[in-house]
From Swiss-Prot:
Keyword Cytoplasm: yes
Pathway recorded for this protein: Purine metabolism; XMP biosynthesis via salvage pathway; XMP from xanthine: step 1/1
Claim: Zinc is one of the keywords in the record: no
Predominant location: cytoplasm
Coiled-coil region list: none
Amino-acid positions noted as binding 5-phospho-alpha-D-ribose 1-diphosphate in the UniProt annotation, renumbered to this chain: 128-132
Intracellular or extracellular location(s): Cytoplasm
EC number(s) from the headed UniProt entry: 2.4.2.22
Provenance organism: Bacillus mycoides (strain KBAB4)
General function of this protein: Converts the preformed base xanthine, a product of nucleic acid breakdown, to xanthosine 5'-monophosphate (XMP), so it can be reused for RNA or DNA synthesis.
Protein name: Xanthine phosphoribosyltransferase
CDD domains: PRTases_typeI (cd06223)
Keyword annotations of the record: Cytoplasm, Glycosyltransferase, Purine salvage, Transferase
């Protein structure tokens, strides 16, 4: 997705060979026009899949998930990382290791909002080692719902998450695939190398 790649090049910051900071438009400050385009692109790619619900994880997956849901005319349910006083019982639960935060979180979805009749599109902001996506897949599988695919805003293709998911036969659609962050430079898969400011 060209507009997303341009945004990464213009506003993203490479912090290391593993970490790309995109808080200027995706996971802290949100660019709603970009999110709208991302939502349209996910909807276009998954329109034939009869999606009934989108599942994501708080908090950075919510904006792209809501925009895709708006385009598809479905609801979004987001997995919580923290326990809520109002959501105690009747939950699907999985453990997810965060590459960025270097910690394990227990994530959960209410059983009241997803069931075996749902066809789910999972959406998240990043795909690195695949732990968040695998955790979300576990929650969806616990509900008995089927998984139509996974939509990723930015995939770090140099890490093994995408490979793990695709080897399981899951359809993964990434809007920007990064081949490398070496030397402070973003290199997209099948794209020219460009310097990040």
């Amino acid at each position: 997705m060209k507009v997303l790649q341009e945004k990464i090049l213009n506003e993203g910051k490479v912090l290391s060979g593993d970490v790309l900071k995109v808080d200027a438009f995706l996971n802290h400050q949100i660019d709603p026009v970009l999110m709208q385009e991302i939502g349209k692109e996910f909807a276009k790619r998954f329109k034939e899949e009869n999606i009934t619900k989108i599942v994501t994880i708080e908090s950075s997956g919510i904006a792209p998930a809501v925009m895709a849901a708006l385009e598809l005319g479905v609801k979004v349910i987001f997995a919580r990382k923290r326990k809520s006083l109002t959501l105690q019982d009747n939950m699907y639960v999985a453990n997810v290791y965060s590459f960025t935060k270097q910690e394990t979180n227990e994530i959960s979805l209410s059983r009241n909002h997803i069931d075996e009749n749902d066809r789910v599109l999972i959406i998240d902001d990043f795909l690195a080692n695949g732990q968040a996506a695998l955790g979300l897949m576990s929650l969806v599988e616990q509900s008995g719902a089927s998984i139509a695919g996974i939509g990723i805003v930015i995939e770090k293709a140099f890490q093994d998450g995408g490979k793990k998911l695709r080897e399981q036969g899951v359809r993964v659609e990434s809007l920007a695939e990064i081949a490398s962050l070496d030397n402070g430079t973003v290199t997209f898969v099948q794209q020219e190398t460009a310097e990040v400011k």
